[in-house]
Design a protein with these regions (language model features):
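Hydrophobic residues in beta-strands of the RecA-like P-loop NTPase core, especially within AAA+ ATPase
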Residues: 127, 144-145
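Short beta-strand-centered segment that lines the nucleotide-binding/catalytic pocket of NTP-utilizing
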Residues: 72-84, 103, 203-204
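Loop/turn-to-beta-strand initiation segments
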Residues: 70-73, 97, 120-124, 138-141, ...
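Pre-Walker A segment
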Residues: 1-77
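Post-Walker A helix-loop "phosphate-sensing" segment adjacent to the P-loop in P-loop NTPases
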Residues: 66-73, 95-97, 197-201
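Short basic/glycine-enriched coil/helix segment immediately N-terminal to the Walker B
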Residues: 39, 133-140
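Post-DEXD/H (motif II) to motif III coupling segment of the RecA-like Helicase ATP-binding lobe
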Residues: 56, 141, 148-204
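Conserved motor-coupling elements within RecA-like helicase/translocase cores
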Residues: 89-97, 101-125, 136-139
Length: 204
């Protein structure tokens, strides 16, 4: 009887990184510079830009920066199943360096991705609100895309929380930064920006 042990990677297979180059326009370059300056002084930056204004490109540039510094990045989306276009764009740009995490994983898949995040092997995690509970080793940045979306709030089952607000607290444990974005910022986030708690960057 021959017994063999075979290693199986259960994490969702992603395409290899493709050469996807893009040039930022003047407004994007200005906004990116404002984000960099903001992170020197504050933990949270809110990007207000209309749909198709180029917020995703700003997220990609910031992700690149933090990963190059050896940090891990968590990219939060309100609903994984409804954001296929953004996921595809990130996959094409980062390839196998990014992993998707969601509540439909079975136990074996959860354990595998959990361990790879805990050891720091995985650098970029894309997920819905439940991804906040992953055991990051060296978290540097949390991106909260469409921060106004009510899907970030969990009512039932417990625990009840807003992933957007929880992200700010979780980031503080790592001395990490939070980059929020929306075409229609939530009242709470806009208020925090007006009170100078967050930095507000407008992308036109």
């Amino acid at each position: 009887l021959l017994v063999q042990r075979r290693s199986t990677d259960r994490i969702q297979s992603l395409p290899k990184k493709m050469e996807v180059n893009f040039e930022l326009n003047y407004s994007q370059k200005r906004a990116l510079n404002e984000i960099d300056i903001s992170f020197e002084k504050k933990e949270v930056c809110l990007v207000h830009g209309v749909t198709s204004s180029g917020k995703t490109q700003l997220y990609i540039k910031q992700i690149e920066k933090f990963v190059s510094e050896g940090k891990q990045v968590l990219y939060l989306l309100p609903e994984i199943t409804l954001t296929a276009q953004i996921i595809r764009r990130l996959q094409l740009y980062f390839g196998g360096n990014i992993a998707i995490y969601h509540s439909k994983f079975n136990n074996n898949e959860r354990i595998e991705i959990w361990n790879k995040i805990k050891t720091g092997e995985l650098k970029i995690i894309l997920g819905a609100r439940s991804a906040l509970f992953l055991p990051f080793k060296n978290l540097g940045l949390i991106v909260v895309d469409e921060e106004h979306d009510p899907s970030f709030k969990q009512q039932d089952p417990a625990p009840r929380y807003n992933a957007r607000d929880a992200a700010v607290f979780y980031a503080s444990l790592f001395n990490a930064k939070v980059l929020m974005g929306s075409a229609t910022p939530s009242l709470e986030s806009y208020y925090n920006a007006q009170k100078n708690k967050y930095t507000l960057v407008t992308l036109k």
